[in-house]
Regions:
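A broadly conserved sequence feature marking short terminus-proximal activation segments
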Residues: 17-56
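Cysteine-rich micro-motifs
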Residues: 18-28, 80-92
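Short, flexible, mixed-charge glycine/proline-rich loop motifs
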Residues: 12-17, 50-62, 76-80
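Short Cys/His-rich Zn2+-coordinating modules
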Residues: 4-10, 41-51, 67-73
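Short functional micro-motifs and their immediate structural scaffolds
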Residues: 10-11, 31, 71, 94
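The feature marks the first
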Residues: 1-19
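Short metal-binding segments enriched for Cys and/or His
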Residues: 29-43, 90-107
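Short cysteine-rich clusters marking metal-coordination/redox-active sites
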Residues: 3-6, 23, 63-66, 86
Length: 131
């Protein structure tokens, strides 16, 4: 698979039994369907992200998994973080620094979990100064 932003080959990193794909060029991360939910423990960390979710704005970037054009949408309603999502395979692309923003958003809710922080740290360590 190649990075949708800079076209560099993505490297696979195993983090807490999940194989994430990261770009050594632009430092983005690809999450296949449901990997993001596992990493941030979505059911516990964030309010219902499907509520108020509508189709995103089309981008020129191809999905690294299925080559469908990614769409840009808000990660959660009422927040400013925009992420790229594949409307076909439902994977999510986070640009460099966006995983930390996900952690900040998760920390603002009633019962935040620390998995997103652990995952970001492990990616940083395994990727050798990733962030």
């Amino acid at each position: 698979m190649n990075c949708p932003k800079c076209v560099s080959p993505l490297n696979e990193i195993a983090i807490e039994n999940v194989a994430l794909d990261f770009c050594p060029g632009c430092k983005g991360i690809w999450f296949d369907k449901d990997e993001m939910a596992f990493v941030i423990e979505l059911k516990n960390d964030l309010p219902n992200p499907q509520a108020e979710r509508t189709a995103g704005r089309a981008t020129v970037f191809p999905c690294p998994r299925c080559d469908t054009k990614l769409e840009e949408l808000k990660f959660v309603p009422l927040q400013d973080l925009l992420v790229d999502r594949c409307p076909s395979c439902h994977g999510i692309w986070l640009d460099n620094g966006e995983l930390q923003k996900v952690g900040t958003i998760a920390a603002g809710f009633k019962a935040p979990k620390s998995r997103v922080v652990r995952v970001a740290l492990q990616i940083k360590l395994k990727a050798g100064g990733f962030f």
